[in-house]
A protein has these predicted regions:
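N-terminal small/glycine-rich loop or linker at the start of catalytic domains
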Residues: 23-41, 99-112, 135, 140
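Structural motif
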Residues: 55, 59, 130-131, 164, ...
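Alpha-helix N-cap and loop-to-helix initiation/capping positions
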Residues: 44-48, 76, 80, 111-119, ...
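Beta/alpha (TIM)-barrel catalytic core signal, keyed to glycine-rich beta->alpha loops juxtaposed to Asp/Glu
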Residues: 3-14, 148-333
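Hydrophobic faces of well-ordered beta-strands that scaffold small-molecule active sites
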Residues: 30-34, 64-66, 96-100, 139-141, ...
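N-terminal binding-site loop/beta-alpha segment at the start of enzyme catalytic domains
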Residues: 1-96
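Short, acidic/polar
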Residues: 43-56, 115-131, 179-183
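Active-site groove signature of glycoside hydrolases
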Residues: 128-148
């Protein structure tokens, strides 16, 4: 990484990135966005984080997705982004679309989690300070809170927009009935619910099965997919066993029990199809999501610049023949 002043690539908007409209709004988002859930915390190299963020923006990624608890440790991904915002991205602030969220465990006590007015307001104030920002482009309710009146959560989102702390709001991982109420409430209060963010990949089809994709579209909202590679399962990482440095080997979110023999055989067959298409399994998995007309953007993580570059190759072929789609369906039955 050079210590020289960062200058964004002149061809960043002509290097192959596709920009898609978020629902019925005026906002265009890159087909691939960069998420900072892991690999950007205080346990990671600031220099490597800077290189990845620079590479992303230089290649047309304008949307950076964060949350208050991203790291590890919680809050450190926003601090990392804030440092890079100050040293590199400040001249380009108006070209960036920055999101953050609140709703998961963040600090001790009864006000450090879920969807109360107190938690959401305090959390966003903390996030803005960590990221060296006056406002975020979109602020999400990170998860539905069954214990807080939904109207309280939603009115807080409305007030956050009116206070100028966020330009837009969104919801993440809301069940369909709660999402229906959220869309209606926000519309009645003249605030755009710009995006629904949900887990969606070849192995998890809930947004289709539960009607979440269609519901978002009918309410004028875009859909952003996270975990598009199923935390690494939809890559070549596990085709020949479990590497010692993999997420499964380390434990945590992805358990060894998740990779059953049946699932492994499905992944192997998907990999063969990807090879026939001239793609890696990861590229095909991203391309499959991007082929869906109701998907606005797909959020990828990145442990390295090389991994991010590989993910961007998915944009080179997002077309699937009817036969290929049928083959995928047959594999995953």
């Amino acid at each position: 990484m050079s210590d020289s002043v960062y200058q964004a690539a002149n061809n960043r908007y002509t290097c192959g990135m596709d920009y898609r409209r978020a629902g019925k709004s005026s906002i265009l988002l890159p087909a691939i966005s960069l998420g900072l859930w892991h690999n950007f915390g205080d346990v990671d190299s600031l220099a490597r984080s800077k290189d990845k963020l620079h590479y992303a923006f230089d290649h047309g990624i304008t949307h950076f997705d964060l949350a208050n608890n991203y790291g590890p440790s919680a809050g450190s991904a926003e601090e990392t982004f804030g440092k890079i915002m100050k040293t590199s991205f400040a001249p380009y602030r108006d070209e960036l679309f920055v999101s953050t969220k609140a709703g998961h465990d963040m600090w001790p006590g009864p006000y450090g989690t879920w969807g109360s007015r107190k938690h959401l307001t305090a959390s966003l104030n903390q996030s803005l300070k960590r990221m060296n920002l006056d406002y975020v482009d979109i602020f999400y309710s990170h998860r539905y809170d069954p214990e807080t009146p939904l109207e309280e959560t939603l009115q807080t989102l409305v007030d956050i927009v009116r206070q100028g702390k966020a330009l837009y709001v969104g919801i993440s991982k809301y069940p369909p009935e709660a999402a229906r109420k959220a869309y209606a409430y926000l519309k009645d209060h003249d605030v755009i619910c710009l995006l629904y963010q949900g887990r969606y990949n070849l192995l998890n089809r809930e947004p289709e099965e539960q009607g979440i994709l269609q519901q978002a579209a009918e309410n004028g909202s875009g859909f952003v997919a996270f975990s598009p590679l199923a935390q690494g399962l939809l890559t070549n990482r596990y085709l020949k066993g479990i590497p010692e440095d993999s997420r499964i080997a380390r434990g945590g979110f992805l358990k060894k029990e998740a990779l059953t023999e049946d699932l492994l055989q499905k992944i192997i067959r998907l990999d063969r199809l990807a090879c026939e298409r001239g793609q890696s399994l990861a590229e095909m998995s991203l391309a499959w999501l991007l082929a869906h007309p109701l998907v606005t953007s797909v959020i990828v993580g990145a442990s390295s610049v090389e991994q991010l570059a590989d993910n961007l190759k998915a944009l080179e072929n997002i077309s699937f023949s009817q036969e290929e789609q049928q083959t995928i369906q047959a594999i995953l039955q």
